[in-house]
Each structure stands twice: as structure tokens, then as C-alpha cells.
Amino acid sequence: AQYRVSEQNPVPIARNIIAAKIQASKRVLQRQIRNYGENEAIQSAVDALNISLRQLKGAAELDVVRGIEGDAAARYFCVFGQLLSEKSGFSFDGRNRRPPRDGVNALLSFVYSILGKDISGALQGVGLDPQVGFLHADRPGRDSLAQDILEEFRAWWADRLVLSLINRGQIKPQDFVTEASGAVSLKAEARKLLFQALQAKKQEKIVHPFLGEEVEIGLLPYIQAMLLARHLRGDLSEYSPFLMR
């Protein structure tokens, strides 16, 4: 069923996932306004994300969904640097990767990569093929479905974790090394601290928005994989991506 839906009708699942991603990104920005007061640039990005959500409702083709997602991500990362406290010593001029060229991007890439591996394992655990996605195109060696599900967790889980480590001063600009190529990576001590922060986060509990039950955050990749498998088997009429209320 996974292969058939991926080929014949990937749009409903892709659209649901991206709607959840944009909502979660919007909430990260709104939280900043709530905590630190009105900010014109951030409010303008929130307004743009609301427009993206409206456009998404009518998107009937995969390329349109991908285009909306790309625009929304660009607007979000355009103001992401304003979520960093000035005294942290970090700056952010937009998303870059392969390789990351600054500390913030190195942290984001590192956390995304760990969560992506967790999601791949969870998908295999419920009998799904991590390489056959709905939103991301299949490419040799890429776990496209894991990348799909990761979209639901980027803002709410990964980005907020990175922001909190930086803004609390737990990770500092001197915790990174820059290679001759310009690639920036974490020093061993900071990497250990990041792992510990991720592990601590995984042990926190939340009420799952779809199941209505208290679960550990670390179980979320498995729960979403299970909900997707149940939808593909026909037990659930649609796939409910992860989105905290």
C-alpha cells in the first residue's frame, strides 16, 4: 500500500505533513512575540505563514505543495536569527547545510540528523520502507519517508531545543571548530552536551494531540510511524501528523 500511495496519490499525506510543519513553525514565532513583545518582522513572517496555510488547502499537486513548503521555510528562517538572544554571541543569516557554515546551522543539522535516524528506525519497526516517501522524492541512499515525518518535528522539537541551548548559554560560539573548507562542526564536549539535552527532552511527557494519552516525547517517531502505517492499511481515514495544540 505504501508504494501504491507514494506513486498514485501522495498529495493528501504530503499536504497534511506540511500543514503541521507550517503551523508548528508559526507557533515558534508567535511564542517569541508573546514572550518578548511585538516585532514587525516576526509578525510579518507569521502573516506569510498564514497565507501559506490557506494556499495549501487548495494544493492538488505535489510540486505546488513543495513550492508552498519552500516559501514558508524561507520566511521562517528569514527571521529565525531574531529568536537568538543578543548576548548569546551567535548570529544566523539563513539556513545552509552540506556542510553547515556557522554554529546555529551546525546545531540544526546535527539535531535533524539524529531525529531522522530515530524516525527511520521507527518506520522499519512498523513495517514501512523509510526510503519511499510522499513529499520528498525518492533518491538512492536517502530515507525520504523519514525526511517526510521529520518535517513535523523540526520546529517544535529540534529548533526549539537548539534555541533553548543557545539562549540559556549552555552552548557557546567557542564550542565549534571551522575546517579549512569553511565547514563548521561541534567540538566533542558540546556534542556530548547536545546528546544529553536530546535524551532529557525524550524523557519529558506530553499529551499526544491525536491519541489523547500521555506519552514520552522519545516515543513520538514510533507513534507517528504507527499512525501512518494504520492509515496506509486502511484503518484510519487520514494520516494525522504530529501537531501540538
Regions picked out by a protein language model, each given a short descriptive name:
Residues 2-245:
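Active-site helix-to-loop segments that bind/position phosphate- or nucleotide-bearing substrates
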